[in-house]
Swiss-Prot record:
It comes from Bos taurus. Disulfide bonds: none annotated. This is Ropporin-1-like protein. Transmembrane segments: none annotated. Belongs to the ropporin family. InterPro entries: ROP_DD (IPR047844). The lineage of its organism: Eukaryota, Metazoa, Chordata, Craniata, Vertebrata.
Amino acid sequence: MPLPDTMFCAQQIHIPPELTDILKQFTKAAIRTQPADVLQWSAGYFSALSRGDPLPVKDRIEMPMATQKTDTGLTQGLLKVLHKQCSHKEYVDLADLEQKWKNLCLPVEKFRALLQLDPCEDKIEWIKFLALGCSMLGGSLNTAMKHLCEILTTDPEGGPARIPFGTFSYVYRYLSGLDSDIPESDTEAYLSSLKENAAARKNGMIGLSDFFVLKRKI
């Protein structure tokens, strides 16, 4: 025989007083992040919330990127979310990183394709994964570096997007090293010229205006 439905009285149902605020914050986060799969994202959100981890939430709503050549689903905003969740570690476990990727409703085949650019075993240096993600957004090496600066900077949005030159040069060498068409001598000559400007004017920092020129259509 089927078991009878369990009945609860009002005194037995405990609703924590903070639930209303939790749901308000969740709703705001969902609106900002606009997840493709709300159920998947919600599971990741509340899992992170229960552990006290950084939440998979964008800082703001993103408009679609017309310049992205392939529809990977990946955006600068989502990379920034991953950076918040992973940057406290120098190396991240691929299994944990893949789960965070899935929680943002990104296709897992794109995650694996990204790792094929620089295959590794169980872990990857976070800054390298971030660099690969920036390169996946499309465009040139300088465009990838632009995305990197805008993610890593502590400057206000729309500001110079400065980061330490040491970080910039490390990532630039890494990405250029993955491209067999870029001679190492060209990379070093380019970084040397940028370093002189950074040392002279920026206190060891480099910003977008030092290397990135937006081409305007006439």
